[in-house]
Every structure is written in structure tokens, then in C-alpha cells.
Curated annotation (Swiss-Prot):
Annotated gene: dnaE
Recorded family membership: Belongs to the DNA polymerase type-C family. DnaE subfamily.
Name this protein carries in UniProt: DNA polymerase III subunit alpha
Superkingdom of this protein's organism: Bacteria
SMART domains: POLIIIAc (SM00481)
Family matches, as NCBIfam families: polc (TIGR00594), PRK07279.1 (NF005582)
InterPro entries: DNA_pol3_alpha_NTPase_dom (IPR011708), DNA_pol3_alpha_thumb_dom (IPR041931), DNA_pol3_finger (IPR040982), DnaE2/DnaE/PolC (IPR004805), DNAPol_HHH (IPR029460), NA-bd_OB-fold (IPR012340), NA-bd_OB_tRNA (IPR004365), PHP_dom (IPR004013)
Keyword check for Protein transport: no
Organism (species): Streptococcus pyogenes serotype M6 (strain ATCC BAA-946 / MGAS10394)
Length: 1036
């Protein structure tokens, strides 16, 4: 029977449409018993192909296509692994090829267990190679020219499932080669997956011996994987068990903990670790963290369930005492649930490459590698790549891809988005392109590198998996799942920005304050830091900076660190339903149900609410007598909602509880509660470790806010300016002679750096800093290198006021810039001896200057116009920070954004405003009636007095606006004798509606009144109308 050997898969990137799952399915439909893959150079899909075939009842045949230079000739070879030994040879051959090291001598040394096929298209009778081979023939091979001494074998290339796929493969070739469709060669036909019986009949008729050769070749092929654990030996000169025991005992003694119950807990953990064969693993992790600390890196408090291990704590792998904080080792490692321990190594992200080099040097470049991942055609990428080949311009591509949401597939966005569907259906070529994009969506596009994963082995990695070359170290061809399935140790080296932040803050405090802070020793009950959490002032704090977490903190108002840990667990679907119960029980407003005195100590810290997975385990241990190992199996069954296992466990739980004298009804009720909570219960060890890191960050924000914002603004891509301003920091004006490159904070002043100016070359910024001081605008331009004498570089410097120290009129400098540049280029160094004729012009207003600064660096650097308005205001208003819910208030604000919607009931327009008063932000709602009145006045960036009712929603204050008044510093002042003509004046003012506030001063009783319901448009006509009734009018 025919066997399909030469199948290119999607791992021959953009040269095939054969994905493995559909390959198995179609192969069975077409009657195949044996199928193969033969990707070019690589074995990316080999493991999943072999396992998938075995699962689907198919015989796998693993092949590899390589081209090799021999006797000044490129020879194309198809290599077939005939057995497990051949499989291992292919691992080495592919690695050599993907590392640029494959040559004929190496190949010949690794052909044991491998059959070689040379396709007939690449064969000639002059070809002489130092090994036996088959000649691969297809339906179109002219057999009359074949060497009668050579064995023939059927070999048909497959790249797609059906002829309809040819157009899509043609598109993939165009994308791969970055060509238009017209420039891309047409795809070969007859490379679809054909019916097995038809091909069998063909070869039986035309070349029966070739078919027999094929059957003989594949008949005994079988591959076996070695899945045994292959941990590297940490120290070959000493027992790992002994070394681990010595190090952990020394660690506890150093911490002053060589006492009970620590000693017995340590012995218990060491026995389990040794019995499971993981002594070397812990020593390796310890060694890696020791390396980081020896370099002065802050390595964090650990993460995940590893924080429940006393061995990890004794080795300083984690920074949490699991005995003191009641964390469970069995949640981490359990003899009744054999799995690799999973200790992720957190490290400052800027030092990750240093760790990779250490691993490579310490354990050997042949014994360690990074792990591959595969970048796929996402919906946006597929649309962009395909539509571009149909000649769609960039702006149309951008508009189309903007309609695709983060979680959308092309099918879902087409179904739910009317505008997207309209664009696709607007042209025939768009419909065609969309069909192709859907076909390639999800297929691998290229390789990438796992963000964290490193694989390590006791022996050479290529004995087990294929590799390819990389920058810092070799990279696996197998993904993380296949790597671990082959018994190899995968470790995650997670570069965390937050560790970088903490370390940089520690260093800056030492430099600026002369204070050495031991991060790991920060008091987790520090009152000032707890107060920060209670206020929800956690922008920039790991795990707590999203609105949901901030609002939850404001509700819970944590009073101790344990409640911060609880907040991370309550901030999850399911658990959040119990937030109100948690708060009321803590405040004594709701009864705490501890169910049974025997489990009361377990539930008391969380007020009778099961928040943590460990609580479920402890209850099973105490109430039903389960071992913690067995309790962990129960926890896993509940988390995974394994109904069959849970039912079995429930009967076991109740029987064991009854044996201990518990009531059956109570036991069943307790089990149901455990079952419910375990579905979303959080890992307490992980919550504790990450809350500790969050607390450390918050400690710096609470005690050293200038240091905190300095580091966050310079090392984070997020915007912390608004948060800093709300914390009473101010953005200071800088000059060309004082502006730093990075942001700088001193004495509550923020000095924005040159790095914030979009599009400013770094080299130009460095040049400015090195060359200053400058004496004038002319001096600066004269000395500026010609390559930087461009308006695109110079205008932003002028707009943010860097030359105000020489010439405060920014508009004047900008208007004269063309002339200045011509003058500089014509006179060069003579500029200083000549006089440039400046053309005068009126400067920007303060508001315009502030807007220019926001445009260039994202924040105003000069005095905020709103501050000037506030200083001159005669109208009373309340700062946003002092608003009280359920009160009437007037606020003086600037509108940041306006969002207009239509109500569902009446279809009328209403608006949501986001506003600020330079210190804090506020959400404002204008319902249809108010919006209809004021909509023509509202404009983003303008200043207003808003009057309304203060409400609370989602634990945040917002205003329901009733009245809007423009807040401009210019007012129309009327001086009148007395109140005699008030009605006439009011009538005249009402006839000239506008946005200028009116203030009336009564000379007789010295009374001044700002009109709240009348604003005017000031004209000469208005002035004439008022003349008979007023002593004087002033517009200022």
C-alpha cells in the first residue's frame, strides 16, 4: 500500500498549508495507514507529528529534507528515520543544518538507522555519493532514464489538501518573498493530498517494484521516546542529597530558625524531595539565585506555590517564611502527585541576558538552550499581509485592522462588526482576499523565543531534542510541551520590570539619602505603606494599579498585610462576590460562620470565607484526616471540575470524617462549600509572595515618593505624571541649558527630559547636553551641526519653551526660524558678528503655550492656565480632591475628553466628560436636557465652571452636571451706581449671549456680583446699548 512520505507541513513556514491535526483527519479519510512529514531542514513538528499519529492509529514516518554541498554540487536529500536510532540521528543532523555546520563527512557519520532518498528531479547518472540511496519517483517521472541498479521508491510531494488551496499557497509565497502576486512564480500543481488507493493502483500498474520497496521500507518503522527525567548533576563530586541538607540547615541557622517546628518540617521536605529525585533541581535553582545576588541583583520574594517550601526559604530561593505564614509544602510538591517542581526564577528584566550566559557557561552550551515558540498569523497580520498583496493602500489597511478587537478572530469580527463586513463585501477582490486571510489565520509564520523558558540536561541535548543556533545560546526546535515530555528540565527565567524598579529605587535612595535599605527586611506591617494601600494610592504598584484593584482596596481599607494578600484573592471572578461579607464580618456587622470548631483556626483569618486553595487542603486534613498529599489531589480535582474524581473523593471525605466522629450532614455540607470555593480559590503562597513584592514597591512610594516617581517615569513606559501631580509634585519649566536627558525629580519638582520629545534623535539630545551652555538662540543655531538644522528637530525645542530664557516670545522664534537657518548657513561662524533682523509678532497666549507643551511632551511644563484663572476667580469652587458625595458643588476644570452617546429609551444625545483640575481627574455626566443646553459650548481643552451633584459609582466620585459656564480669565466688568437699572441691564445682556462672564460692581454699597446665569458676546453694539445705564464697561 502507498505511504505518503514527502509532506511539507506548516512548519516549512509559508511553503505549505498542511497543519498536523487536519493531516491526521484527511489521511484517515483517504485510506492511509502510514504517513510522513518531510520539512526542509527542521524538525519543529516532529514530536507532535509522531504522538499525533500514534493517537490517531496511524504509523508515523519522520523525514527531513536537507540540501548539502558535495563536490561543488548542491545535492537534495530526503532522510527517513527507520527506527528510534534513526530518529536520534535526525535530531543531530537537523541541529547541524540549522546551525550552519552540516557537511558530507558529518552526515555520513550519522546515517545509522536512516534511509536516504534522492528525488528523481535532482538525480542524474553522474551523481556519486558515499552512501546507498533510493531514487524517489512520482507519477511524472520518466522511468526509462532511471538507473536499473538503483532501487526506486514512490515519492510524491504534498503541500496542500486540495487544488483550491493553490491560490492561498501562492499568496504565502508572495508574503514569504515580499513580492507582489504578479512577481511570485505560480505554485506547482498536483501537490494536494491524494487518495491512497488511487496512488496504490497507479504504482502497482506502472512501477510495482517501487511500491514494494516502499512497503519494505516503512513496514517496521517505530519510534520510542525516552521520557525519564534527565536533571543535570549540580556537583558530581558530592552527593546532592547531602549537599542540600547541609545548605538548608546552614540557611535556617543563619536565620535563627534552627528549632522546632522548623527542624521537623525541614526533614519532612528533604525526605520528599530526595525520594522524588529533585535534590539536584533545588541546588541548581539555589545556584542561579546565588549568582544573581552575587552581582547585586534584587531577586524578589519568589512566586507560586514554591513559597510554601521551607527548603526554598532556607536556600533564599523565596523570601517568605512558610511556617510563620502557614503556607503548605504539599501545594508545591506532593509524592502522591508526581510532577516536576516548578520554581520560576524572577529577576530584573535588564539582567536576563547575564543569566543566560551564566547558565551556558556553568552547565555547557550543549546542555542548555532557550525554548522556541511560534508566531502565528493573527487576524490583523493575516489581513495586512494578504490585502497588501492585492494592492490595498496602507491607510485602508489601518482603517480595516482597527475594526478587529484583541480577542477577535476573522470569523467573529465579520459576524459582529457591520462596518467590517461592509468593507469586505464592497469589492470582489476584498472578498477573495478575506477568504485567503481566513485560510492562513492561525498558521505559524515564523519562530520566536519563549519569553522565559530555558531547558537544561545532564547529557547533550541533541540526544533528546533538535536545536538551532541563537544569539545568546542555542534554541530548541521543540516547543515547551515537547521539551518537558522528553524528560528535560524546563526552567522559567522571568525578567520582571518590577524587580528592576525596586532595585533601582534601592540604589537611588542609597545615593540621594545615604540610606541602605534591605528590601527583603522591609516591615510588611509598615503603617505608612498600609495607609497608602487603604487609600487606593497604588498607581504603579505591581498587582494593584488597575481600577478594579484600586476600588477594592478603597472598600476593604487593609489594616494589616494579611488583608492585602486577601485583596489579591478577592479581586477575582467568583471570590469578589464575597467582598461585602468580608468587610462586614471584619467590622463585626455580620456573623462569622466557622462551621466547626476543629476548622475554625483555618477560617478565622479570612472571616469564615474560603479564599485560598490551601484552606481547602487544610480542612480536608483536619476534618477528614486526609494527608496533605491526598488533600492536594482533592484540591486539583475540584479546581479542574473533574466530576468523576470529585464524586469518588466526596465519598472518601465523608467516610473519613464519619470515622473521626463528624456528623454526615455537616460533612456533606462542608464538602459542597469546599467544592464551590475551590473553583476560584487562589494559591495563597503565590498571593503572599507577590503581595510582598507589591508592598516593597509601595514602601518606596510611601516613604520616598520622589525616588519612586523618578524611577517609574524613567524605566516604565506607562504614564505616571498624572499620579505624581495628584501627589503634589509639580512640573517645572526647563531651559536649553538645564533640561536633563531623562526625567529628574528634585524637591517635589519634575523636570521633564529630552527623551520625551517625540522624534528627537538621541545623538542630538546628547550633543545639546555636551555643548551647553548656550548664550542665545543665535548661538545655539550657529553651533548646531548641519544634520540637525531641521525644523522637525528644532520646533519642538522652541514650543516647550527651552529658549524662553533668551526670547520669551515663542511665536516670534518659530516665525523667524526659516530666516535664522538661512542666515546661519550663509554666514556660519560670522553669525555672532552680524545682526539678524528679527520680524516681530504677537506671542501665543498662556493657554496656547500650555497646549503646545502637551503636544510635544504629553504634559504642560509652564504654569497651567487653570491656575491663573483660579487665582483671578471671584467665583467660589471646590477642588476635586475635596468633593464629598451627595453634595452640590462647583468645580473649576479643563475638559480632557467628551464622549457622546444616545440613550436607549429616547435616542436623545447625552455626554460623558473626563475633566481635571490640574491635580485630580473627575468623570462628569450630562443628561440629555443639560447636554442640549450646553453642547455648543463644550470643547476639549477648554476651561469651565461645572455645577452639579456629586455621586459615587464603583467607589469613585463623579458629577451629574446641571450647569456649565466658560471659565476664562477675561471678564466683562460693569460699574454701576446702584440697583436702579438691574432689569434693563439684565435684558440687554440676555440679548447678546456668548461665553464671557459678566461681573457687576455697585459703586454705592461697594458690592461686587458675578452673574452665574448670564454670559455674553462682547461687541461695540453691546457697549452702546449699556451706555445709558452704566458708569463704565471694562473688558479684561
Amino acid at each position: 500500500m502507498f505511504a505518503q512520505l514527502d509532506t511539507k507541513t506548516v512548519y516549512s513556514f509559508m511553503d505549505s498549508l498542511i497543519d498536523l491535526n487536519h493531516y491526521f483527519e484527511r489521511a484517515k479519510q483517504f485510506g492511509y495507514h502510514t504517513i510522513g512529514i518531510m520539512d526542509k531542514d527542521n524538525l519543529y513538528g516532529a514530536y507532535h507529528f509522531i504522538k499525533g499519529c500514534q493517537k490517531n492509529g496511524l504509523q508515523p514516518v519522520l523525514g527531513l529534507e536537507v540540501e548539502i554541498l558535495y563536490q561543488e554540487r548542491q545535492v537534495l536529500l530526503n532522510l527517513i528515520a527507520q527506527n528510534t536510532q534513526g530518529y536520534h540521528q535526525l535530531l543531530k543532523i537537523s541541529t547541524a543544518k540549522m546551525s550552519g555546520k552540516l557537511h558530507m563527512d558529518y552526515l555520513c557519520q550519522h546515517l545509522e538507522g536512516i534511509a536516504v532518498i534522492i528525488p528523481s528531479k535532482g538525480w542524474s547518472d553522474t551523481l556519486v555519493v558515499p552512501f546507498d540511496y533510493y531514487i524517489g519517483v512520482d507519477q511524472y517521472t520518466d522511468l526509462s532514464h532511471m538507473d536499473s541498479k538503483r532501487q526506486l521508491i514512490p515519492l510524491r510531494t504534498v503541500r496542500y489538501f486540495a487544488q483550491d488551496d493553490m491560490e492561498t499557497l501562492h499568496m504565502l509565497h508572495a508574503i514569504r518573498d515580499n513580492l507582489s502576486l504578479a512577481e511570485t512564480p505560480v505554485v506547482e500543481s498536483d501537490q494536494e493530498l491524494a487518495d491512497c488507493q488511487q496512488l496504490t493502483t497507479f504504482y502497482q500498474t506502472h512501477c510495482p517494484q517501487a511500491l514494494q520497496n516502499l512497503e519494505d521500507l516503512v513496514s517496521g518503522i517505530y519510534y520510542d521516546f525516552d521520557t525519564n527525567l534527565k536533571l543535570p548533576h549540580f556537583n558530581r563530586d558530592k552527593s546532592a542529597k547531602q549537599e542540600l541538607q547541609e545548605l538548608t540547615e546552614a540557611g535556617l541557622k543563619e536565620k535563627g530558625l534552627w528549632k522546632e517546628p522548623y527542624q521537623s518540617r525541614l526533614l519532612h521536605e528533604l525526605i520528599i524531595i530526595s525520594d522524588m529525585g529533585f535534590d539536584d533541581y533545588f541546588l541548581i535553582v539555589w545556584d542561579l539565585l546565588r549568582f544573581g545576588r552575587s552581582k547585586g541583583y534584587y531577586m524578589g520574594m519568589g512566586r507560586g506555590s514554591a513559597a510554601g517550601s521551607l527548603v526554598a526559604y532556607a536556600l533564599n530561593i523565596t523570601g517568605i517564611d512558610p511556617v510563620q505564614h502557614d503556607l503548605l509544602f504539599e501545594r508545591f510538591l506532593n509524592k502522591e502527585r508526581y510532577s516536576m517542581p516548578d520554581i520560576d526564577i524572577d529577576l530584573p528584566d535588564i539582567y536576563r541576558s547575564e543569566f543566560l550566559r551564566y547558565v551556558r557557561n556553568r552547565y555547557g552550551s550543549d546542555h542548555s538552550a532557550q525554548i522556541v515558540t511560534f508566531s502565528t498569523f493573527g487576524p490583523k497580520q493575516a489581513i495586512r499581509d494578504v490585502f497588501k498583496r492585492f494592492g490595498v493602500p496602507e491607510y485602508e489597511l489601518t482603517n480595516l485592522t482597527k475594526k478587529i478587537g484583541f480577542k477577535d478572530s476573522l470569523a467573529t469580527v465579520y459576524e459582529k462588526s457591520i462596518s467590517f463586513r461592509q468593507v469586505i463585501n464592497s469589492r470582489t477582490e476584498f472578498q477573495k482576499a478575506f477568504a485567503i486571510a481566513k485560510r492562513i489565520e492561525g498558521n505559524p509564520r515564523q519562530t520566536s523565543i519563549h519569553a522565559a523558558g530555558i531547558v537544561m540536561s545532564d547529557d547533550t541535548l541533541t540526544n533528546h531534542i533538535p536545536l538551532k543556533s541563537g544569539d545568546d545560546m542555542m534554541i530548541t526546535q521543540y516547543d515547551a510541551h515537547a521539551v518537558e515530555a522528553n524528560g528535560l528540565l524546563k526552567m522559567d527565567f522571568l525578567g520582571l520590570r518590577n524587580l528592576t524598579f525596586v532595585q533601582k529605587m534601592q540604589e537611588k535612595v542609597a545615593k540621594d539619602y545615604g540610606c541602605q535599605i534591605d528590601i527583603a527586611a522591609i516591615d510588611l506591617e509598615d503603617p505608612q505603606t498600609l495607609a497608602l494601600f487603604a487609600k487606593g494610592d497604588t498607581k504603579g504598584i505591581f498587582q494593584f494599579e488597575q481600577n478594579g484593584a484600586i476600588n477594592l482596596l478603597k472598600r476593604i481599607k487593609p489594616q494589616r498585610f494579611e488583608e492585602i494578600v486577601a485583596t489579591t484573592s478577592l479581586n477575582r471572578p467568583g471570590a469578589s462576590d464575597y467582598t461585602t461579607n468580608f468587610i462586614k464580618r471584619r467590622e463585626g456587622q455580620e456573623k462569622i460562620d466557622l462551621i466547626d470548631p476543629v476548622i475554625a483556626p483555618i477560617l478565622e483569618p479570612t472571616y469564615g470565607i474560603m479564599l485560598y486553595q490551601e484552606q481547602v487542603m487544610q480542612i480536608a486534613q483536619v476534618y477528614a484526616g486526609f494527608t496533605l498529599g491526598k488533600a492536594d489531589l482533592l484540591r486539583r480535582a475540584m479546581s479542574k471540575k473533574n466530576l468523576q474524581e470529585m464524586q469518588k473523593m466526596e465519598e472518601d471525605f465523608i467516610a473519613s470524617a464519619k470515622h473521626l466522629g463528624r456528623a454526615e450532614e455537616t460533612a456533606r455540607g462542608l464538602f459542597k462549600r469546599m467544592e464551590k470555593f475551590a473553583g476560584y480559590g487562589f494559591n495563597r503562597s503565590h498571593a503572599f509572595a507577590y503581595s510582598a513584592l507589591a508592598f516593597q514597591l509601595a514602601y518606596f512610594k510611601a516613604h520616598y515618593p520622589a525616588v519612586f516617581y523618578d524611577i517609574m517615569m524613567n524605566y516604565s513606559s506607562s504614564d505616571y505624571i498624572t499620579d505624581a501631580l495628584e501627589s503634589d509634585f509639580q512640573v517645572a519649566q526647563v531651559t536649553i541649558n538645564s533640561i536633563p536627558y531623562t526625567d529628574k525629580i528634585e524637591a517635589s519638582k519634575i523636570y521633564m527630559g529630552l527623551k520625551n520629545i517625540k522624534g528627537l534623535p538621541r545623538d542630538f539630545a546628547y550633543w545639546i547636553i555636551e555643548q551647553r551652555p548656550f548664550n542665545s538662540v543665535e548661538d545655539f543655531l550657529t553651533r548646531t551641526p548641519e544634520k540637525y538644522q531641521k525644523k522637525v528637530f528644532l520646533e519642538p525645542l522652541i514650543k516647550i519653551g527651552l529658549f524662553d530664557c533668551f526670547e520669551p516670545n515663542r511665536k516670534k522664534i518659530l516665525d523667524n526660524l526659516d530666516g535664522l537657518l538661512v542666515f546661519v548657513n550663509e554666514l556660519g561662524s560670522l553669525f555672532s558678528d552680524s545682526s539678524f533682523s528679527w520680524v516681530d509678532t504677537q506671542d501665543y497666549s498662556a493657554t496656547e503655550k500650555y497646549s503646545l507643551e502637551q503636544e510635544v511632551v504629553g504634559v504642560g511644563m509652564s504654569k497651567h492656565p487653570l491656575i491663573d484663572i483660579a487665582e483671578k476667580s471671584i467665583q467660589t469652587f471646590t477642588p476635586i480632591s475635596q468633593l464629598v458625595k451627595e453634595s452640590e458643588a462647583v468645580v473649576l476644570i479643563q475638559i480632557d475628553s467628551i464622549r457622546i452617546i444616545r440613550t436607549k429609551t429616547s435616542g436623545q444625545q447625552m455626554a460623558f466628560l473626563s475633566v481635571n483640575d490640574t491635580k485630580k481627574k473627575l468623570d462628569v455626566t450630562l443628561f440629555p436636557q443639560e447636554y442640549a443646553i450646553y453642547k455648543d459650548q463644550l470643547k476639549e481643552g477648554e476651561f469651565y465652571y461645572l455645577k452639579g451633584r456629586i455621586k459615587e459609582r464603583d467607589h469613585r466620585l463623579q458629577m451629574v452636571c446641571q450647569q456649565v459656564q466658560m471659565a476664562i480669565s477675561q471678564k466683562y466688568w460693569l460699574l454701576v451706581e446702584n440697583h436702579q437699572f438691574d432689569s434693563q441691564i439684565s435684558e440687554i445682556l440676555g440679548a447678546f449671549p456668548g461665553t464671557t462672564p459678566v461681573v457687576i460692581h455697585y459703586q454705592k454699597n461697594k458690592e461686587t456680583i458675578a452673574l452665574t446665569k448670564i454670559q455674553v458676546h462682547v461687541t461695540e453694539n453691546l457697549k452702546e446699548k449699556l451706555r445709558p445705564f452704566v458708569l463704565k464697561t471694562v473688558f479684561r
